[in-house]
Each structure stands twice: as structure tokens, then as C-alpha cells.
């Protein structure tokens, strides 16, 4: 799940970069068109003055009728005097049309990454999922996990979260522990032999309740509420006081 979310974020960033590039092309073409139009207008000015002088002479009957007609046709048929702005506008519209879906898809990936689809009830609760994305039932969990067992499910926002089986072997602890190390984000495995969570990346260690017993981790593991709702395991955000520190949760 974490890898797929990282991939989605990478796609979103790349798509946004493509969108910015295409938009820059459209803007540059528009500015280029404005500069070319100004240049064309400058070119038009001199012929137009010549034409006006010619018309003035024509009006004074200084040219024969055949010459008057030739002057008018020469001016009106000169293609350099009329810039083809229709094609330029069409190209700009096509570029902008290409940018729109790219930006929209990038925004969709961004929203999916930071607000992934969740299962579960109201109040911010989500259903625990196994590694394949299937809902985890309390019955199946207790069949495969003994008392004091700590094992991972996909929890809030897809984060790996430890469920803790109580001493009776048939109920879950009222809180779960987010398995992401508070140092640099590695997933911290549970070491039953030492009764600690031990980070394999930089050596941080956590007690069974998730508080730090050895750095460099600066903060305890994040808590989540755990509830058995008629056999369905639900997790919800922990926003009240952190019972391990007596303070407001650092993640809230």
C-alpha cells in the first residue's frame, strides 16, 4: 500500500510537470504570436502609407484607370499584410485542451495519495485490512494470533498498524500502534524475544506500548483506537491525551 501510494504521488508530480511544460508552450506561442503580429503591423505600415499616397494620387486623377486598379489589387492580394492568427489560436486551444486532463489526473492522484479510500463506519473509523486488502474479522484474527501477540494490519490512511491481543487471548487491546518509526519512517518490526519494537534502519527501540526506550527516534509510536464491532475490527484516530506522555498527541 505504501509503495502504491508513493507511485501515485510520483505519477501526480510528473503529470503536473508535463502540464506546466505544455502550459508554458501555450504561453510562449501566444507571446510569440503577439511579437510576430507587432512585426507584421510594422511591415504593414510602410506599404499602407504607400498605398494611401497612391490612392491620394488616384483621387487627383494622376494615374490612369488601369493603374488605379493595379495598385488596389496589389495591396489587397499581398498575403504578408494579413497575419494568419486563426491557425495560431487553434494550436493554442489544442495545447490548452491537452493540459486540462493532465492536470485533472495529477490532482486525482494527489487526492488519492493524501486521502485514500477507506472502509468502515462513521466518526473517522476504518476497517482493518490484511496485506491483500481484505477486511479482517475478529474471529479469524484470534484463531491465528495468541495472547500478547502483536501483528500488522492496514489501518488509517493505509498505514501499517499493530493490533495487540490481550492476555485472555480473545479480545483486542483498546489501542493499536502505528508501525512507522518516528525517526525516518521505516516500518518497525516487533521482536517478541526482547519484548520490544526494534527499528532495523537506525536502531531505535520502543516499549510494548510504543514509547521510546532508545533513540534516535524522538517521539513514541502513534496511537489508534481499536474496536471490535460485532466481529469487525475498526480503527479510529486517537486525538485525546497520550497516556504514555500525559500530553497532547504529537500527531494530532
Swiss-Prot record:
This is Cytochrome b6-f complex iron-sulfur subunit, chloroplastic. It comes from Bigelowiella natans (Pedinomonas minutissima). The keyword Transcription regulation does not apply. Its EC number is 7.1.1.6. This protein is 1 of 2 subunits of the cytochrome b6-f complex that are encoded in the nucleus. The Rieske iron-sulfur protein is a high potential 2Fe-2S protein. One of its GO terms (molecular function) is plastoquinol--plastocyanin reductase activity. Its main location: plastid. PROSITE patterns: RIESKE. It is a single-pass membrane protein. The 4 large subunits of the cytochrome b6-f complex are cytochrome b6, subunit IV (17 kDa polypeptide, petD), cytochrome f and the Rieske protein, while the 4 small subunits are petG, petL, petM and petN. The complex functions as a dimer. Binds 1 [2Fe-2S] cluster per subunit. InterPro entries: Rieske_2Fe-2S, Rieske_2Fe-2S_sf, Rieske_Fe-S_prot, Rieske_Fe-S_prot_C. Gene3D superfamilies: Rieske [2Fe-2S] iron-sulphur domain, Single helix bin. It is found in: Plastid, Chloroplast thylakoid membrane. Disulfide bonds join 186-201. Keywords: 2Fe-2S, Chloroplast, Disulfide bond, Electron transport, Iron, Iron-sulfur, Membrane, Metal-binding, Plastid, Thylakoid, Transit peptide, Translocase, Transmembrane, Transmembrane helix, Transport. Belongs to the Rieske iron-sulfur protein family. The chain crosses the membrane at residues 94-114. [2Fe-2S] cluster binds at residues 181, 183, 199, 202. Component of the cytochrome b6-f complex, which mediates electron transfer between photosystem II (PSII) and photosystem I (PSI), cyclic electron flow around PSI, and state transitions. It is an enzyme of class 7 (translocase). Residues 141-235 form the Rieske domain. The keyword Nucleotide-binding does not apply. GO terms for cellular component: chloroplast thylakoid membrane.
